[in-house]
Each structure stands twice: as structure tokens, then as C-alpha cells.
Curated annotation (Swiss-Prot):
Extent of the signal sequence: none
Annotated family: Belongs to the MDFI family.
Role, per record: Inhibits the transactivation activity of the Myod family of myogenic factors and represses myogenesis. Acts by associating with Myod family members and retaining them in the cytoplasm by masking their nuclear localization signals. Can also interfere with the DNA-binding activity of Myod family members. Plays an important role in trophoblast and chondrogenic differentiation. Regulates the transcriptional activity of TCF7L1/TCF3 by interacting directly with TCF7L1/TCF3 and preventing it from binding DNA. Binds to the axin complex, resulting in an increase in the level of free beta-catenin.
Main localization, broad class: nucleus
Gene: MDFI
Protein name: MyoD family inhibitor
Region annotation (Disordered) ranges: 1-76, 91-151
InterPro entries hit by this protein: MDFI/MDFIC (IPR026134)
UniProt source species: Homo sapiens (Human)
Compositionally skewed regions (Low complexity) per UniProt: 14-26
Subcellular location: Nucleus; Cytoplasm
Subunit structure: Interacts (via C-terminus) with AXIN1 and LEF1. Interacts with CCNT2. Interacts (via C-terminus) with Piezo channel composed of PIEZO1 or PIEZO2; the interaction prolongs Piezo channel inactivation.
Annotated PANTHER family: MYOD FAMILY INHIBITOR (PTHR15304:SF1)
GO cellular component, one term: cytoplasm
Amino acid sequence: MYQVSGQRPSGCDAPYGAPSAAPGPAQTLSLLPGLEVVTGSTHPAEAAPEEGSLEEAATPMPQGNGPGIPQGLDSTDLDVPTEAVTCQPQGNPLGCTPLLPNDSGHPSELGGTRRAGNGALGGPKAHRKLQTHPSLASQGSKKSKSSSKSTTSQIPLQAQEDCCVHCILSCLFCEFLTLCNIVLDCATCGSCSSEDSCLCCCCCGSGECADCDLPCDLDCGILDACCESADCLEICMECCGLCFSS
């Protein structure tokens, strides 16, 4: 009833337990018609290097100080050292001057003052100090001149005219004083020793000048008026003080 073919299936040729050859895709489809079999082609040659690259990426970097092994960079190695800002940026090419405490000048000035304190020359400051004395003297003379000018300018015009009048009167009073002295000499007749003295020896009411023929023209009452009047005496004393100040 059944026809036995001369060809035996390949699965029967292999002994029991031996792996048989893999069936072809057509056989697998015919044997399992109700199942969907994925017939994607696998590439073992390409999968192998991909797995190797994944293993290389997954393997951690060896740590150690041995030669030839690259060391991992630390985060501290990437930090750049920062410098503290001590001054404001300026356009001066010389840079910032060092900060100095309060009440302290430039180092060169400090050195100059120390040298001056030790007895050395302090620079042009000493010459300036020496030159101040004549200037002060000239200023004092100028002040005195200006003060005298101011006092003369402060005197009003009327007062200046009065001064001139007083000077004229004082000169007249001085002449009057000399006249009074002559009259006094004539009244006493103490200075009538020469021949020309007969003019001064002719006083009224005196008999000593009998040899003199000239009449007595002088009034002896002038002397009495000058001596009796306190005002005239005071004026004469003032005139004497002005004329004979020495």
C-alpha cells in the first residue's frame, strides 16, 4: 500500500544520540505551518566585535601608579590658581603702589625725614626755612609803612589845616618869647654893659639910665600881663615845648 522510497531520510542515517544536520528553512515551515517562524539572518561575525567593544567600554580603567598606564585626571588638577585682587585696575603701566597704613607717607619721604633728623641735609626744605626770615622782616616794614599811611590818611582835611595853623602860631609865640626875654633883660639892666645897650636900659621909672638920652618907648606892662595871665603862660610853655623840644 505504501511505497517505500529508495532514499532514506537524513535523520535516520545518523546514529542515535548524534546531532543531525539542521533542517532547511523549507522543512521547518512545512513542519510548523501554524507558527510564525522568524527567519532573520544572524551574523555571528559582526556580533562578536560588538560584544568585544561593549566589554572594553564596560571594563573599568585600571588604577595604579605603574608605568605605561594612563592616570585619570582629578578635578583638582583642572582648577586654575586664582590670585587675590588687591587693587583696582588702572591705566598706569607701572602697576599699583603698595598699600601703606594711615599717617604714613612715601618711603622716599620717610627716608628724607630720617636723614634730616640724623643731622644730614634735609633737602630744599632747609633753604626754604632760612629764606623765610628776610621775607618776614620785609613784611613787617611794609605793614608799618601801610599803618603810618593809613593813620595819615585817616586824619581829616580840616584837622590838617588846624595843624598848620598851630605850627604858625607856635612860631609866632617863639618869637614872642624872645621878645619877652629882651624886655626882661632891659627891665633888670643886668646885660647893659656895652655902649649899644642904652636902648635896652631905658625902662620907665628907672634912674639907672640917666646917661641915655633916648626916651623909654617900651611898656613894662607887657611883662606883667604875661606873668599875670595863666593862659598866656600856658601857651608860652607849650610853644617852648614845641620850639625847644630837646
